[in-house]
Structures are given as structure tokens and as C-alpha cells.
């Protein structure tokens, strides 16, 4: 059984017991979260889609921790003008363990 959820503007295919890295959520470590935007659920070989979401389905999980991804360097320059800009960015994420798919 798997489900496709939407959170943080992205879609994730999850199964029970999976550990996924999501865009940062406003939840404390150790707390439980529920994802109501379930786009599709596959149960016993039957795949059901929503239009755009399934109203009766939800996915629950537990927040393991928060963190930041690897550093990405953004470097901009203008040729022959001696203009250089170097900037770094680390995207925050939330690590979630999927506990149950309710369908």
C-alpha cells in the first residue's frame, strides 16, 4: 500500500514505515502530523485518484527532527565589469516517519 501526498508544493510517494525529507513544517520534534492532501492511494492493487484530492484519505506521521540540506553556492558575475556576487544557501527540511495511511 502506498499513497501520493502533497506538502510544501511538492508531491511524495510514501509507504508505511518510510522516512522522508519534506520541506520545513511548523511542528515540534516528536509530535505527530497529518497530511490531508492525498492525491492517490494504491490499496491491494486498486489505485484510486482524487480530483484533485481524496476527501476520505489521510496520512499520519511522526516528526523525527529538523535540519538543513547541503550548502548550494550561487555565483553571479558580469563579464568585464569586475562585479562578483557569491551567496550560499541551505534549504531547511523536516524528517518525518510515515506511520499510517488511512484510506
UniProtKB/Swiss-Prot annotation:
<protein>
    <recommendedName>
        <fullName>Large ribosomal subunit protein bL21</fullName>
    </recommendedName>
</protein>
<dbReference type="GO" id="GO:1990904">
    <property type="term" value="C:ribonucleoprotein complex"/>
</dbReference>
<dbReference type="GO" id="GO:0003735">
    <property type="term" value="F:structural constituent of ribosome"/>
</dbReference>
<dbReference type="InterPro" id="IPR028909">
    <property type="entry name" value="bL21-like"/>
</dbReference>
<dbReference type="InterPro" id="IPR001787">
    <property type="entry name" value="Ribosomal_bL21"/>
</dbReference>
<dbReference type="InterPro" id="IPR018258">
    <property type="entry name" value="Ribosomal_bL21_CS"/>
</dbReference>
<dbReference type="GO" id="GO:0006412">
    <property type="term" value="P:translation"/>
</dbReference>
<dbReference type="GO" id="GO:0005737">
    <property type="term" value="C:cytoplasm"/>
</dbReference>
<keyword id="KW-0687">Ribonucleoprotein</keyword>
<keyword id="KW-0694">RNA-binding</keyword>
<comment type="similarity">
    <text>Belongs to the bacterial ribosomal protein bL21 family.</text>
</comment>
<keyword id="KW-0689">Ribosomal protein</keyword>
<dbReference type="InterPro" id="IPR036164">
    <property type="entry name" value="bL21-like_sf"/>
</dbReference>
<dbReference type="GO" id="GO:0019843">
    <property type="term" value="F:rRNA binding"/>
</dbReference>
<dbReference type="Pfam" id="PF00829">
    <property type="entry name" value="Ribosomal_L21p"/>
</dbReference>
<comment type="function">
    <text>This protein binds to 23S rRNA in the presence of protein L20.</text>
</comment>
<keyword id="KW-0699">rRNA-binding</keyword>
<comment type="subunit">
    <text>Part of the 50S ribosomal subunit. Contacts protein L20.</text>
</comment>
<dbReference type="GO" id="GO:0005840">
    <property type="term" value="C:ribosome"/>
</dbReference>
